[in-house]
Amino acid sequence: MGYLKKVGMCISLLIVIIFVTSCGGGNKITGDSKETQIKKSFAKTLDMYPIKNLDDLYDKEGYRDGEFKKGDKGTWGISSAMVKQPKGKIMRSRGMYLFLNRNTRTAKGYFIVDVTSNDTLKKTEDKEKRYPVKMVNNKIIPIGPINDEGIKKEIENFKFFSQYGDFKGLKNYQNGDYSYNSEAPTYSAKFQLSNDDYNVKQLRKMYDIQTKKAPKLLLKCTGDLKGSSIGHKDIEFTFVENQEENVFFTDSLEFTPSEDY
């Protein structure tokens, strides 16, 4: 009788342990490993790269949830920006944001030039200038006259990273640093790349990147790991990051309700 009682107590204790374990792991992902699930989530977007013809996005469906109104086909938002701050100098960034409305099959956005100076005796000064643009037949065109021929040419020749980047080998990236916060929710993956990496070579071709340091790649997302139209995913290639010098590149591709833009 005593033996049966002990067995019953052990079974009860085991049930309690299983219950507590299953309910208490706030940042624990069941099923596939955390790394695998995070990679799969980013792959849903990054597998689309490269999108050589941005007009293809008009016929490309993205993740939909209850945030979309009935009949709304959604809008693709894409952006790419290069940020440089040589040692002892001001920070300059140049990039473009474009929003492709699948309902109207039109795309508008802006090219941005930003200069940020930090004087220890004054407040940080941020000077930003936006140039409205539109896209017609996969070509970026300024809206309105631009006196600066250099800026005009830069706009017309601009390429988003999503047009030439390639993440088909993402699943093979090794030694990643993964984080997941189910309460925020946010998740990310960081990798140390080499200068032989395809995407790093492409960035060096597109931009005058002086440093020879290989960048770190950060994939980060705000939103549910299972998918959400509220959150957004960002890509960052950080070549140099400290108080005196910064060189990094950012990129984003997201699908949202059209009323957000």
Curated annotation (Swiss-Prot):
Pfam families: DUF576 (PF04507). A lipid is attached at C23 (S-diacylglycerol cysteine). A lipid is attached at C23 (N-palmitoyl cysteine). PROSITE patterns: PROKAR_LIPOPROTEIN (PS51257). It is a lipid-anchor. One of its GO terms (cellular component) is plasma membrane. It is found in: Cell membrane. Gene3D superfamilies: 2.50.20.40. Its main location: membrane. Residues 1-22 form the signal peptide. InterPro entries: Csa, Csa_sf. Keywords: Cell membrane, Lipoprotein, Membrane, Palmitate, Signal. Transmembrane segments: none annotated. Belongs to the staphylococcal tandem lipoprotein family. This is Uncharacterized lipoprotein SAB0392. It comes from Staphylococcus aureus (strain bovine RF122 / ET3-1).
